[in-house]
């Protein structure tokens, strides 16, 4: 009995415990599901959410504007089949590769099979999204300097046609960038401008140009040359427009008042065009190409290219004051983020009129004219002096030749009748007469030269020389008379005369050319000495013959 009662008591206890547990569990489940049913969330989602860590909500990432980078190629880049163009595009492409997307690179160039293939390969190698636009070179009929503007119009017409939204910037292939520049360029909402430094390798100078600002609003444009330290204001949008030139070396400012820029006046005088502005230092919103009234489309019927887009951008840069801002905000040139490398092609140097020559005043022209006359007069006098000396030498030579010709002619005239009348008995007399004639002619030839001799020693020395000549001739005649036979006298005498005349002529030829007024006496004495020497040389073989006879 006791065992049965105990088992019943245990069963009751367990039953009560199970009932109590079930009631508590049911109440707990009901209490937990009641608020979830009120919010409409499922129990599974609420349970999963209860186990997730709490994370602060991140703000949405703003969408960046598209950068439209336009690069025009130089017309002379095709001369080397596009090799220099390929190098420049590769360098710029790797710079743009570091810019945060989205970015579209538009490259414009003339149609050329080789150059186009090189350019496309270079663009593909940079892994930058690009579009390569070409145009027929024969369609461009303007001056060579306007072809760059024509290429810019090609790119702007493409952007306008396809309505590409973004910020347009003209990037030269030889430009160097600071990557912070592209971050500020994306913030453009109208027109932006910034300072740019142009480094010239040929002139070894740096030209700085950019906008002038007033509270981040662009009010004008200036240019500054490092070589002259002169700052020139190209245009100013204030009411009293002035063109200012400032020389930093002398701290002097020269100001010239100009006419104020007026929109109506600019429309009437549209042919003059807006002031020249470096388009590489300007950026603008592309939506202005189809939203603004200035960009009314006037296409070329053959090419579909709007020829007025680039000029409209320049005009808009001047007139739209509310939409312009500077980069950086204060337009300070102390922070330059864009450099342009000016690398001109090496061409043969052609002499051109320098600005100094073109700007010579009347006083400078008179001075240069006087200097030219001073240089011409001495040269003319020197030329006249040389001509006079040559004429005197020529006259002396001519007179001397005439004297020799007369001597020879007289000798021949005497020999001709004498030879015909000579007999064996008269040969001696004719020989003596011929010798006397030779001596007489020599004396006649010496007569004008004796006039130049001094009264003292010159006359005595000349007489002694003549006496020696006569003595030598007499000695020669004596020897010849004894040794010559009747048949040989005539032949030897003729040969001797021919030799004397030939030797005199040979000596006179080089001496005539070098005769001057002061040298006449010396050359005459040398000639006489040579005659005596030749006569002595002739006597030597004749004396040998005489001894043998």
Curated annotation (Swiss-Prot):
Alphabetized UniProt keyword annotations: Cell wall biogenesis/degradation, Glycoprotein, Glycosyltransferase, Golgi apparatus, Membrane, Signal-anchor, Transferase, Transmembrane, Transmembrane helix
Regions crossing the membrane: 17-37
Coiled-coil features, chain-numbered ranges: none
Entry GO MF terms: galactosylgalactosylxylosylprotein 3-beta-glucuronosyltransferase activity; xylosyltransferase activity
GO biological process, alphabetically ordered: cell wall organization; glucuronoxylan biosynthetic process; plant-type secondary cell wall biogenesis
Residue spans, topological domain Cytoplasmic: 1-16
Sites where a glycan is attached: 112, 139, 214, 229, 240, 251, 264, 269, 300, 421, 452
Biased composition, class Basic and acidic residues, residue ranges: 350-363, 441-465, 472-496, 503-524
Region annotation Disordered: where it falls in the sequence: 232-252, 350-371, 413-432, 441-524
Subcellular localization(s) per the UniProt record: Golgi apparatus membrane
Primary residence: Golgi
InterPro entries in UniProt: Glyco_trans_43 (IPR005027), Nucleotide-diphossugar_trans (IPR029044)
Ranges facing Lumenal side: 38-549
Membrane topology of the entry: Single-pass type II membrane protein
EC number of the protein: 2.4.-.-
GO cellular component, one term: Golgi membrane
Family classification: Belongs to the glycosyltransferase 43 family.
Function, in words: Involved in the synthesis of glucuronoxylan hemicellulose in secondary cell walls.
UniProt protein name: Probable glucuronosyltransferase Os01g0157700
Organism, as annotated: Oryza sativa subsp. japonica (Rice)
């Amino acid at each position: 009995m006791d065992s049965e009662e105990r088992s019943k008591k245990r069963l009751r206890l367990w039953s009560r415990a199970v009932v109590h547990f079930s009631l508590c569990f049911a109440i707990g489940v009901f209490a937990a599901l009641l608020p979830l049913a009120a919010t409409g969330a499922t129990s599974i989602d609420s349970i999963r959410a209860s186990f997730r860590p709490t994370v602060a909500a991140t703000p949405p990432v703003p969408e960046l504007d598209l950068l439209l980078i336009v690069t025009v190629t130089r017309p002379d880049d095709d001369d080397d089949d596009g090799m220099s163009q390929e190098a420049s595009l590769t360098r710029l492409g790797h710079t743009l590769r570091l810019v945060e997307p989205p970015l579209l690179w538009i490259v414009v160039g003339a149609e050329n099979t080789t150059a186009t293939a090189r350019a496309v390969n270079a663009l593909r190698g940079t892994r930058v999204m690009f579009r390569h636009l070409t145009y027929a070179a024969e369609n461009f009929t303007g001056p060579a300097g306007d072809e760059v503007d024509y290429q810019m119009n090609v790119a702007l017409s493409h952007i306008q046609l396809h309505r590409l939204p973004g910020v347009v910037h003209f990037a030269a292939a030889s430009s160097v960038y600071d990557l912070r520049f592209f971050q500020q360029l994306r913030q453009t909402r109208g027109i932006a401008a910034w300072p740019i430094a142009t480094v010239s390798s040929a002139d070894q100078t740096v030209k700085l140009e950019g906008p002038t600002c007033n509270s981040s609003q662009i009010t004008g444009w200036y240019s500054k040359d490092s070589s002259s330290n002169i700052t020139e204001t190209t245009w100013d949008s204030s009411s009293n427009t002035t063109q200012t030139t400032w020389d930093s070396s002398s701290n002097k400012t020269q100001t010239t008042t100009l006419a104020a820029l007026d929109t109506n006046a600019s429309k009437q005088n549209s042919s003059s065009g807006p002031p020249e502005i470096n388009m590489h230092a300007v950026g603008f919103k592309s939506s202005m190409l189809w939203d603004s009234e200035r960009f009314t489309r006037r296409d070329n019927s053959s090419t579909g290219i709007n020829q007025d887009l680039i000029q409209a951008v320049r005009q808009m840069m001047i007139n739209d004051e509310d939409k312009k801002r500077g980069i950086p905000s204060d337009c300070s040139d102390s922070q330059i983020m864009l450099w342009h490398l000016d690398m001109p092609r090496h061409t043969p140097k052609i002499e051109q009129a320098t600005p100094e020559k073109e700007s010579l005043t009347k006083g400078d022209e008179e001075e240069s004219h006087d200097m030219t006359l001073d240089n011409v007069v001495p040269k003319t006098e020197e030329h006249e002096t040389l001509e006079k000396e040559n004429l005197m030498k020529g006259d002396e030579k001519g007179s001397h030749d005439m004297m020799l010709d007369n001597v020879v002619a007289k000798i021949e005239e005497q020999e001709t009748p004498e030879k015909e009348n000579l007999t064996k008995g008269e040969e001696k007399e004719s020989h003596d007469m011929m010798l006397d004639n030779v001596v007489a002619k020599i004396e006649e030839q010496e007569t004008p030269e004796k006039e130049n001799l001094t009264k003292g020693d010159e006359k005595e020395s000349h007489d002694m020389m003549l006496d020696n000549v006569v003595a030598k001739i007499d000695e020669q005649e004596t020897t010849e008379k004894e040794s010559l036979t009747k048949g040989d006298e005539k032949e030897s005498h003729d040969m001797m005369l021919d030799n004397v005349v030939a030797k005199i002529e040979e000596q006179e030829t080089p001496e005539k050319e070098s005769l001057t007024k002061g040298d006449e006496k010396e050359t005459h004495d040398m000639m006489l000495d040579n005659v005596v020497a030749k006569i002595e040389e002739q006597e030597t073989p004749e004396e040998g013959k005489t001894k043998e006879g």
